[in-house]
């Protein structure tokens, strides 16, 4: 199989397949975002990510002023299994034309 045939995108999961062993961005339910290296995935978007940076955003309302208070929490996780039913969006790395 030639390199061109391997890089062909015929269905959405092909784009994710091309991102194996590269850093991707994953947006999850509950205002969680992940950036990490994609090691494996399946048709349900279950994923195994390595060297993950998780960002959790919470919005609270101040009881006195009724202003929104936005808090962002970050943590680093060495290895993470992501269940596919919580995935909203997967973004492959940006590729530039050579």
UniProtKB/Swiss-Prot annotation:
Task: Report disulfide bridges, numbered on this chain.
Answer: none
User: Matching Gene3D superfamilies, A to Z?
Assistant: 2.30.30.100
Pfam families, alphabetically?
LSM (PF01423)
Which UniProt keywords are given for this protein, alphabetically ordered? Acetylation, Cytoplasm, mRNA processing, mRNA splicing, Nucleus, Ribonucleoprotein, RNA-binding, Spliceosome
Tissue expression, as annotated, is:
Expressed in roots, leaves, stems, flowers and siliques.
**What Gene Ontology cellular component terms go with this record?**
Lsm1-7-Pat1 complex; Lsm2-8 complex; mitochondrion; nucleus; P-body; spliceosomal complex
What is the top-level taxon of the source organism?
Eukaryota
| Compartment(s) of residence | Cytoplasm; Nucleus
Sites bearing N-acetylserine, chain numbering: 2
Instruction: Name the Gene Ontology biological process terms.
Output: deadenylation-dependent decapping of nuclear-transcribed mRNA; mRNA splicing, via spliceosome
| Subunit-level organization | Component of the heptameric LSM1-LSM7 complex that forms a seven-membered ring structure with a donut shape. The LSM subunits are arranged in the order LSM1, LSM2, LSM3, LSM6, LSM5, LSM7 and LSM4. Component of the heptameric LSM2-LSM8 complex that forms a seven-membered ring structure with a donut shape. The LSM subunits are arranged in the order LSM8, LSM2, LSM3, LSM6, LSM5, LSM7 and LSM4. LSM3B subunit interacts only with its two neighboring subunits, LSM2 and LSM6A or LSM6B.
Task: Tell me, in a sentence or two, what this protein's role is.
Answer: Component of LSM protein complexes, which are involved in RNA processing. Component of the cytoplasmic LSM1-LSM7 complex which is involved in mRNA degradation by promoting decapping and leading to accurate 5'-3' mRNA decay. The cytoplasmic LSM1-LSM7 complex regulates developmental gene expression by the decapping of specific development-related transcripts. Component of the nuclear LSM2-LSM8 complex which is involved splicing nuclear mRNAs.
Q: Which family does it belong to?
A: Belongs to the snRNP Sm proteins family.
The identity of this protein, by name, is Sm-like protein LSM3B
Q: Which organism is it from?
A: Arabidopsis thaliana (Mouse-ear cress)
């Amino acid at each position: 199989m030639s390199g061109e045939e391997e890089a062909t995108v015929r269905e959405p999961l092909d784009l994710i397949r091309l991102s194996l062993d590269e850093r991707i961005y994953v947006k999850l339910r509950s205002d969680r975002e992940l950036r990490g290296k994609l090691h494996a995935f399946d048709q349900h978007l279950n994923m195994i990510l390595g060297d993950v940076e998780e960002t959790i955003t919470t919005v609270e309302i101040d009881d006195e002023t009724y202003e929104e208070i936005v808090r962002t929490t970050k943590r680093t996780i060495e290895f993470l299994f992501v269940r596919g039913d919580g995935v909203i969006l997967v973004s492959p790395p940006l590729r530039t034309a050579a």
